[in-house]
Each structure stands twice: as structure tokens, then as C-alpha cells.
Amino acid sequence: GGELDYVRSSIGIDRIYDLEKEVADKTINQLLNFNDDEWAEKGKKYIKQIQNINTNHKSFFTDKMPHNFMMCGLIHKMLPQAKIVFCYRDAMNNCFSLYKNTFGTSGHGYSYDQTKLSKHYNLHVKLMKHWKNVLGDKIFLLKNESLIDDQKGVTAKLLKHCGLEWEDQCLEFYKTQRDVRTISIRQVRNPINKKSLGLWKNYADSLSEMQKSLKEFS
């Protein structure tokens, strides 16, 4: 798996963020007009794209495209058996991590401005609360800080949600030899730790806008 753009392309929409109102309204109307058979076909199209890259013929894969959070309802419509996992962090820990990194032209331009970043994060929190209310147990909530405090316990609950058996290797993910393409590659290659918790406090005087505006997911 990885950060795949297959949800959007399978549904057939150009993009899901930074849309002009007219385009957004047209996209929403388009989505509302799909019937169950059409959603099922889009699900098959998604699986077909996955099969093209699943050279090891694995039974399970992950799609961690950041913007997928906007489409949880659509994902459920076209892939009703999909397991949705919402990974989130303390708001300041999360947004400081975004603010200090460079994403190039990957669709995260909001992350370079504290006001825009706070607005984006808060809208993301509001939307995820909506999806959780609508989809209920279809969405598994995984808070980073909880995973750090109890890696084994939280991992066991995650595996149960996904219908997977326990494997001790789950606690040693950093030993994997597979290719990893993510801005957090250094974290992936190391055990879970608390190094990034509260790191933003070292720069608190320069982060007043975020401290004032951010809302927690709860």
C-alpha cells in the first residue's frame, strides 16, 4: 500500500480540495446521483488498480493517502467491507509536525501558514466527527499518544478491528526491509518513542496563532 490516489480516480473526480464553489457543487451533485450498482463498479475499479501493484498477492493492503479523510463516506459506499482507521494526534503535536516540514506541491500548501493550517485542521476535526457519527464502528479511532503509551494493547485492538490475527512482528515494524516512501521515513525505521511529544513547546512563542485556534478531536 502507501499514499495512493486510487479512491479519487476510481470515483472519477478531479480532486477534492481547493475547489471553486461552482465546481464543488457540480461534484457533489455528481456523487449524489450515483446508484448502488455504480458505486459497486467504482469499488471494483479501485480493487483492479490495487491488483496492478499488488505483485506479492497480499490479501490486505493499506491506503494512507492523507486526503482520504475527506472521502470516508464515499469509501464506505464503494468498498463497504473496507476497514477505516482514523489516526490522529494531539492538535499541537500534529500541526507543528506539518508546519515544520516541506511538502512541495503535494497539496499541503495550507501547512506553511498558521492561520490556514489551523482552519484546515479544525475543518478536518469537524468532518471526522461527522463521519464517526454516520459510520460508527466502521471507523476505528487510533490516537498516536495512546499508541505510544500502550503499543501492544492498542495494536491488539486495531488488529481485531481489521479482522487480523496477532503477530509479534507488529511490535517490530521498524525492522521491515520493504521500500517506504513517506516524509516520516526516519520514524518508520525506529521503534515507537516519545521524542516528538510536546516538541512544539520549544517554539511556543512563535506558534501563538495555532495555540489560540486549534481544536482537539474528541
Predicted segments — roles?
Residues 70-73, 96, 152:
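Short N-terminal helix/helix-N-cap motif within the alpha/beta-hydrolase-1
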Residues 2, 60-65, 83-88, 141-146, ...:
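Short beta-strand segments
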Residues 14-15, 23, 30-58, 98-141, ...:
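PAPS-dependent sulfotransferases, especially Golgi type II membrane carbohydrate sulfotransferases
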Residues 75-79, 85, 89-109:
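Conserved P-loop NTPase nucleotide-binding/switch module
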Residues 5-7, 89-94, 147-149:
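Conserved nucleotide-binding/hydrolysis micro-motifs of P-loop NTPases
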Residues 79-80, 135:
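Short, structured coil segments at secondary-structure junctions
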Residues 1-79, 87-88:
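Phosphate-binding active sites in nucleotide-utilizing proteins
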Residues 70, 80-83, 159, 163:
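Hydrophobic/aromatic-lined pockets within catalytic cores
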